[in-house]
Amino acid sequence: MVVLGQGAVPGLDPLARVAGRGTHANLPQDFGFAPVEAAGKALARAVITWADVAAVELNEAFAVQSLACVDAWLKEGLVDPEIVNAKGGAIAIGHPLGASGGRVLGTLAHRLRESGDRWGVAAICIGVGQALAVVLENVSGSAA
């Protein structure tokens, strides 16, 4: 990850730009739903809506946690489950300790580049009711 304001790295072209970010904390007993709120805040900061989003990467600390988030988004009519973890999530491809953020952001940036879609959301549940979310904008030159 490179902060472009600090100068470009010769020979490296950025894949994506962080367009918005959000955090949220629930009571610990409601931990699984925090990514839903964090993602909504990130979208608001990016000044886009779920209708603009083509890809979602959601960490799977536990299967039920991911299902709870997708179910909450479905109940609101916000997200097509087909765009969530389209290449498999942590249960399928691994969940290295301390690497969830890098894994979901990297996977999302590459999904956007491969598809040519412009917007994606990465969200992670980080424990004890907390969550982080980031909106990425594809700037790789293949954005639609």
Model-derived segments and spans:
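Claisen-condensing/thiolase-fold acyl-transfer catalytic domains that form or cleave C-C bonds
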Residues: 1-144
